[in-house]
Every structure is written in C-alpha cells, then in structure tokens.
C-alpha cells in the first residue's frame, strides 16, 4: 500500500512539475505581443504642409505654422519615439491621397539625416547631418522645414523647446 501511495505521489509531482515548466517557459505577458512576429506600435503625428491652409486675406502664402497638417502614422514601440518620428518625417512618405489633398513636403532631402538627439529639462536638441546644405534656401522654405520637425517633436509632452545643431541648418 505504501508503495502504491508513493508511486501515485511521484506521478502527481512529476505532472505538476511538467505543468509548471510549461507555464514558466511560456509566460503570458500583458504588455508584449502574444506571438513572436507581432509588433507593438504607437501612433505618432508627422507634420506636413498644405499651402492652401496658409494664405492671408490677399491670398498670399504666409509661410507659417498655420499650414502644418498632422498626419498619423504607426511606428514600432521603442525607447526612442521622438527620434523614430523625426526619422520617419525625414523620409517624406506621403500617400497619393494625401498629395492629392494638397499636402506636401520637401523631405526627403539628399544627405540629411538625424545624427543624434538629447532631451534635457524640456529642451530637445536635434543634431543633423547635412553634407550637401539641403536645409538652406529661401526664408519661406527653411521656415517650413523647421516648423515640420519642431511640430513633430513637440507632440511629445516632455518636449517644450527644440534646438538644432549645427546652427547653420535652416538658414535662408
């Protein structure tokens, strides 16, 4: 009788251990994807430009923030959402429908890339590479390029101010 009880207990322990191993090796995570190929995303706003929204009483283009249009995009969840949003903006990807509605961008600019970013007490400093001086030009153009990046960055509540380096960027 004792041998039968011992064997029964041994079977129960082995079964419980097997079940525990399955649970431990495949935990249910409420914060991550359930399947390995599933990606967690977040929605960000990229700011593009529509000159029809940026005209004064005389129908002149004002070259102001009034022409900025936020478009929602999905990006992969990461520890660097600000940089990810700026990098996506720099790609300048608009759909045909967005272009048909009057939304434009001069991005991508050949050679322009985000080199780094730092956030200190609400001031976001963005460092760019611009080996071909593509961020220069007329005051209207460079203002809109600046506004697009600034508005895209300021959607994040921790960003209160945006600075660009080198300082030669976005100069008329």
PLM feature segments, named:
Residues 1-172:
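Bimodal "functional hotspot" detector
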């Amino acid at each position: 009788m004792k041998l039968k009880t011992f064997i029964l207990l041994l079977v129960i322990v082995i079964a419980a251990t097997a079940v525990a191993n399955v649970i431990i090796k495949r935990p249910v995570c409420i914060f991550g994807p359930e399947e390995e190929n599933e990606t967690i995303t977040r929605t960000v706003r990229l700011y593009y430009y529509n000159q029809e929204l940026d005209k004064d009483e005389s129908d002149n283009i004002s070259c102001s923030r009034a022409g900025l249009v936020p478009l929602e995009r999905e990006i992969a969840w990461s520890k660097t959402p600000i940089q990810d949003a700026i990098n996506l903006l720099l790609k300048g990807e608009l759909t045909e429908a967005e272009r048909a509605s009057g939304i434009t961008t001069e991005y991508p600019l050949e050679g322009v890339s985000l080199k780094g970013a730092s956030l200190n007490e609400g001031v976001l400093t963005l460092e760019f590479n611009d080996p071909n001086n593509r961020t220069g030009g007329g005051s209207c153009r460079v203002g809109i390029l600046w506004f697009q990046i600034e508005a895209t960055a300021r959607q994040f509540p921790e960003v209160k101010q945006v600075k660009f380096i080198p300082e030669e960027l976005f100069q008329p």
